[in-house]
Amino acid sequence: MDMILRPGRLEDADACGRIVFEAFKSIASQHNFPLDIPSAEIGIRLVTRMLSHPGFYSLIAEMDGTVVGSLFLDESGPIAAVDPLTVDPAMQNQSIGRRLMLAALERVAERRFAGLRLVQSAYHYRSLCLCAKLGFVAREPLSKMDGAPLEIKFPGYDVRPALVGDLAACSALCRRVHGHDRGGELQDAVSQGTARVVEHLGAVTAYATDIAFFAHAVAQSNQGLKALIGAASSFGGGGFLLPTRNGELFSWALQQGLRLVHQMNLMTTGLYNEPAGAYLPSVAY
């Protein structure tokens, strides 16, 4: 069967969402890990949101008129992110994932993004090896953490909802830590009411689009991240990602009763700066 790649359409949401669920379910079940996408309905909602968002580009793999895989690129910032790439488990071993990723790399080069990033499950060796062969470099081991809300406050580190007026300060903080901003994601989170900032000594010293699987946070120090994590009312998406090499923060999270769900890897091509501060990545990067 011949395969074609085409841009996604809103009417693809049902087929793509079900494949997203089945793909995550298949690999997680093989390794006896919890599902990051726990139901087809959640997969469909996720895909619908991305197909409807102007900051996302979608590629659909189709064989004989049937959707067999998809890839979504978050193009809302200077760094593009794969979020996610999935293939129908019944259609494996036909290089579908490879062709989708090659097409994504070609688009990133054509659109002159500074780089392309992704986060993949550490137990998914096939994904890890494919990405490495295509030029991605493993940069950071990540720990997905989950548990009950901590309800912890830190004197002098005040957490409040982020406002439109905070966007410039938050983006400047992100540029200091990462060398680029994530303004598109941040603006969406402010509009949705999920973003939070930490004020310390009269200045914004940390922000989070949420403390969740699909969200990121940036801070001058671990204390800002602890304040954001401590104030979170829940950890959406089955938990949040924490750089495992941040030993102080990882140890603190465990001491507060949070548990390790599984390990993931941050992988990059193109621009990458070693972070000059504290951060929590999203499942995109």
Q: Which role fits each region the language model picked out?
A:
Residues 17-58, 62-63, 67-70, 175-195:
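Active-site rim helix/loop that mediates acceptor-substrate recognition in acyltransferases
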Residues 128-152:
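Short, structured interface segments
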Residues 1-2, 54-58, 62-64, 88-89, ...:
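Intrinsically disordered, low-complexity, positively biased terminal segments
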Residues 8, 85-87:
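Hydrophobic adenine-recognition pocket in adenosine-nucleotide-binding enzymes
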